[in-house]
Amino acid sequence: MAMRSGRHPSLLLLLVLLLWLLQVSIIDSVQQETDDLTKQTKEKIYQPLRRSKRRWVITTLELEEEDPGPFPKLIGELFNNMSYNMSLMYLISGPGVDEYPEIGLFSLEDHENGRIYVHRPVDREMTPSFTVYFDVVERSTGKIVDTSLIFNIRISDVNDHAPQFPEKEFNITVQENQSAGQPIFQMLAVDLDEENTPNSQVLYFLISQTPLLKESGFRVDRLSGEIRLSGCLDYETAPQFTLLIRARDCGEPSLSSTTTVHVDVQEGNNHRPAFTQENYKVQIPEGRASQGVLRLLVQDRDSPFTSAWRAKFNILHGNEEGHFDISTDPETNEGILNVIKPLDYETRPAQSLIIVVENEERLVFCERGKLQPPRKAAASATVSVQVTDANDPPAFHPQSFIVNKEEGARPGTLLGTFNAMDPDSQIRYELVHDPANWVSVDKNSGVVITVEPIDRESPHVNNSFYVIIIHAVDDGFPPQTATGTLMLFLSDINDNVPTLRPRSRYMEVCESAVHEPLHIEAEDPDLEPFSDPFTFELDNTWGNAEDTWKLGRNWGQSVELLTLRSLPRGNYLVPLFIGDKQGLSQKQTVHVRICPCASGLTCVELADAEVGLHVGALFPVCAAFVALAVALLFLLRCYFVLEPKRHGCSVSNDEGHQTLVMYNAESKGTSAQTWSDVEGQRPALLICTAAAGPTQGVKDLEEVPPSAASQSAQARCALGSWGYGKPFEPRSVKNIHSTPAYPDATMHRQLLAPVEGRMAETLNQKLHVANVLEDDPGYLPHVYSEEGECGGAPSLSSLASLEQELQPDLLDSLGSKATPFEEIYSESGVPS
């Protein structure tokens, strides 16, 4: 026991000593590490950076495309040297692990070691590589203890794709005259394997050609894939070829694919056109152009209606003067010879044409596998032309000429001479165009002279030129004609006076614009200096024009017309003298109508005014007929009403004063004039009046004073009808102051003679005025104010009283209808 207890203190002492040594060692170690850290920090400051030792260790990760397995398959292993000091856990993430594409493709066996596995085959063409992240964490804390490792897993390529053409079949067209060695088509195949590797390198091969011809073939460039022509193509031999092309890669094992190319040969011009006949003869009449005088047939073995078949003709020799032209018939391919310029038998009765033919497309030939230009000249034919004689037309020398003459030349003035020649026959001249009939031509000599005065202002003159056309006609069969033209230039003279323009002759002015100036325009067909500027002057010798009108500003061709006072509605004449630049003038009249305007711009009642012109012209005629009808009615009344054997009264034989009486009473009002007033006005001529009962419009005689009644009784006498000389008795008047009428029948003719003479004179004057107005061609229409419609005068045949014997007392009971006539006759002293 004592020994055991003695050992224990020594053990404890040894243990304490060890702990002290460990503490000192730890302190020294910490101090050393601190010093080292400080030293390293200083070295980092004062020394360049150095690469630290890698703590990640990873084997090469390689994965072959389309690896058959078995799966899962180990592809690599990870290691981190920090696993010596602590317990670590490895993590993997990224595309192929937990991200697209290919989720779940890679994984770790467990998290304690870094073995990496793949779980299925990989298509490199889909995903050529994967970028994955590796991390290491402390198992106890889950804290990442080192920097993440980023690793790119590359998928190695295998030759698993063959080259592919974009189409299974190709259709191309090649010209027959395609030059050998030139590429005609480019083949291209695509290999999806890794680029710039043998797996994606493509080579091209021509496997077969159908048909296989020795002189016509194709070849393919192995690297570029261009198809080239070897030799010459012949459309007639092989119009189409079929080529089988293969594309192969250089991988192990190599893969390939094929495609078919159909080559259509488009025919070229490799056959020369040839005339079916080498010599032609044709007869052509002289003096006229002709179409299709000859057709030349050619043969061509190329395909019809192509540019290699269509013929193109050309006149190589004999057409130096341009008489001929040749074209091609598009349907038959024939050459059509035309005469476009008339031939002349006298100049060249015969000639020869050399015509050549070629195609629209260039002609080529194949020799020794190469295209060569033609060595022979184009095919030709000879056409012998025989010109037949015909009647040549005359020819003018010169065909047209200009003659300058002053207008107003007298008849017989020589204008010029036409000269025509015809080697075959005689010539006569005919005038065919002379619209104004101013000239004549001598049929033998062609001399043109005037037969009428010529006027530059004629409508047949255009820009001072008057055209005269002459024909020269020969006496051949059939007759031929030539045309010559004389251009007559007329110099102007001052032979026209200025005149008013049509729109300035008759002008309308609204009442509201009567003080605004009117623009009066004039014109003169003469040229400078015989025309404008014009001078305008008012004719002050005519009426009161200077008191009403005034001329304003002169514009050369027009002048302002101003009014000096207000004018009522109506028609006015404004006389003007208008002179040209040389002083030649003439009096002109402007007709101005002042009228109302509803809109302020245009006169109204235009239609009524036009009708008024005709009514005004017919008014004197109508008045004459009305006066005649009234006179006849009056005579009929006197004849049938008055009794021939009534008492007469002595009447003075004086004619009396010819005082005008106003017959404008249009109503049935009562007259305010007494018999004494009438008697005072016309004392020398007493005309009887009678009333059948109470007469409207005339006072009863009972209301008249005795003196006036006696005078009135003397004025009532018995008169026969006009010109009949039959006496009549006045009707009884109910008045105590009335006296019997004079029974002398010879008084009738004495009283009617002056009245009948005045009536005949008046009718003759009216008829004369009507005839003058009707026959006067220089009458200018006037506008009159509206006076109503003119009543038509009834014809004599419409008066029934002339056709039968009427009772003497027929007119005694007319009543109020005859009152206006009785008033008029009683006021004027005419017997009723």
UniProtKB/Swiss-Prot annotation:
Which is a Gene Ontology cellular component entry for this protein? plasma membrane
- InterPro entries from the entry? Cadherin, Cadherin-like_dom, Cadherin-like_sf, Cadherin_CS
Query: What is this protein called in UniProt?
Result: Cadherin-like protein 26
Signal peptide, first to last residue: 1-27
Q: Which CDD domains does this entry report, sorted A to Z?
A: Cadherin_repeat
Q: Which residues lie on this side of the membrane: Cytoplasmic?
A: 636-832
Q: Which organism is it from?
A: Homo sapiens
Q: In which tissues is it expressed?
A: Expressed by epithelial cells of gastrointestinal tissue.
Q: Which PANTHER family match?
A: CADHERIN-23, CADHERIN-LIKE PROTEIN 26
Please list the GO biological process terms of this entry. Answer: adherens junction organization; calcium-dependent cell-cell adhesion via plasma membrane cell adhesion molecules; CD4-positive, alpha-beta T cell activation; cell migration; cell morphogenesis; cell-cell adhesion mediated by cadherin; cell-cell junction assembly; homophilic cell adhesion via plasma membrane adhesion molecules
- Topological domains, Extracellular: 28-614
The domain of life for this entry's organism is Eukaryota
- Main location per the UniProt record: membrane
One example GO MF annotation: calcium ion binding
Instruction: Quote the subcellular location field of this record.
Output: Cell membrane
Q: How is it modified after translation?
A: N-glycosylated.
Q: Where are the transmembrane segments?
A: 615-635
| Subunit note | Homodimer. Component of a cadherin:catenin adhesion complex composed of at least of CDH26, beta-catenin/CTNNB1, alpha-catenin/CTNNA1 and p120 catenin/CTNND1.
**Domain remark text:** Three calcium ions are usually bound at the interface of each cadherin domain and rigidify the connections, imparting a strong curvature to the full-length ectodomain.
User: Where is the segment annotated Disordered?
Assistant: 813-832
Q: What does this protein do?
A: Cadherins are calcium-dependent cell adhesion proteins. They preferentially interact with themselves in a homophilic manner in connecting cells; cadherins may thus contribute to the sorting of heterogeneous cell types. Ligand for integrins alpha-E/beta-7, ITGAE:ITGAB7, alpha-4/beta-7, ITGA4:ITGAB7 and alpha-4/beta-1, ITGA4:ITGAB1 through which modulates CD4(+) T cells activation.
Where do glycans attach? Answer: 81, 85, 171, 177, 462
Name of the coding gene = CDH26
UniProt-listed Pfam families: Cadherin (PF00028)
